[in-house]
Amino acid sequence: MTDMPSVTTPALDRYAVFGNPIGHSKSPIIHGQFASLTLQPLSYEAILAPIDGFEASLRAFFQAGGKGANVTVPFKEQAFALCDSLSAEATLAGAVNTLSLLADGTLYGDNTDGLGLVADLLRHLGSLQHKRVLLVGAGGAARGCILPLLKAEVGQLVITNRTQSKAQALVEIFSQVQQGRYSDKLQAMSMPELSGEFDLVINSTSASLAGELPPLPQSIIGNKTACYDMMYGAKPTAFNQWAVQQGAAQVIDGLGMLVGQAAKSFALWRGVEPDTSGVLKLLRDKLQADAQ
């Protein structure tokens, strides 16, 4: 009787998402689906890091063999500070959502939020070229999206915020880092100053989560305007409901951005970009089921 040859299962590369809270995270589901789809040997888990212990938690993960990590609220700025090298998107965002441990042991940081947004917008709209775009909000979510939107060749990008000085500061920071590039396409305006219809209005604020609305003039929405809320839920967000009432041609929520940024992170780590349509449908169906 001959011995059967032993079959060794290849070790799974470890990835994780760090946050606090983290129980709500859909990242393990998304990356698990991506791994199955692309036949990549990896595991992906959610790790609750103590508010005052993110760095220690992250270092322990990498010392135990972790290959890469996603970072969510409230640790994106801390992750930025820990990186040895950064992408242009991360530098401009001042925040990191994707960490990679390089072969030399150093930490590389990227921000794929804006790339995920643009990927979802292109999926819905086909092109952003020459479009007049309004970005509502001047926080971290907005910062991460400016460069990807401009790289997508929008015609004009206007940033508006309740506190106008924050929008203006964001434009100035961007202009300094980019040494004046795109200055002809980027500007800040106060909400009362806004005039004329926009092709695309993006809400980067979390106001919808509280059922609130930024005080935007109705005149910015026309019958060809697409509106995008980075927030999402089982029902249309407060912002998207308002946009429909103003006659917007199309409203889109941020679930596709969530899946899109995850796909960009996955591609950064594994060298293959997964198709997002199946995962997006799975999450959308789950949202609807959980709401019933």
Curated annotation (Swiss-Prot):
Please give the GO cellular component terms listed in this UniProt entry. cytosol
* Pfam families the record matches: SDH_C, Shikimate_DH, Shikimate_dh_N
- Oxidoreductase in keyword set: yes
So where does shikimate get bound?
S25, K26, S27, T72, N97, D113, Y232
User: What processes does the entry annotate via GO biological process terms?
Assistant: amino acid biosynthetic process; aromatic amino acid family biosynthetic process; chorismate biosynthetic process; shikimate metabolic process
Documented EC number(s):
1.1.1.25
User: Would the keyword NADP be found if you checked this record's keyword annotation?
Assistant: yes
Q: Which SUPFAM superfamilies match?
A: Aminoacid dehydrogenase-like, N-terminal domain (SSF53223), NAD(P)-binding Rossmann-fold domains (SSF51735)
Ordered alphabetically, the record's keywords are: Amino-acid biosynthesis, Aromatic amino acid biosynthesis, NADP, Oxidoreductase
What one GO molecular function would you report for this record? NADP binding
**This protein's pathway:** Metabolic intermediate biosynthesis; chorismate biosynthesis; chorismate from D-erythrose 4-phosphate and phosphoenolpyruvate: step 4/7
**Residues at the catalytic site:** K76 (proton acceptor)
Which reactions does this protein catalyse? shikimate + NADP(+) = 3-dehydroshikimate + NADPH + H(+)
Top-level EC class: oxidoreductase
PANTHER family to which the protein is assigned, alphabetical: BIFUNCTIONAL 3-DEHYDROQUINATE DEHYDRATASE_SHIKIMATE DEHYDROGENASE, CHLOROPLASTIC, SHIKIMATE DEHYDROGENASE
Q: Please describe what this protein does.
A: Involved in the biosynthesis of the chorismate, which leads to the biosynthesis of aromatic amino acids. Catalyzes the reversible NADPH linked reduction of 3-dehydroshikimate (DHSA) to yield shikimate (SA).
Similarity field: Belongs to the shikimate dehydrogenase family.
* SUBUNIT field: Homodimer.
The name on file for this protein is Shikimate dehydrogenase (NADP(+))
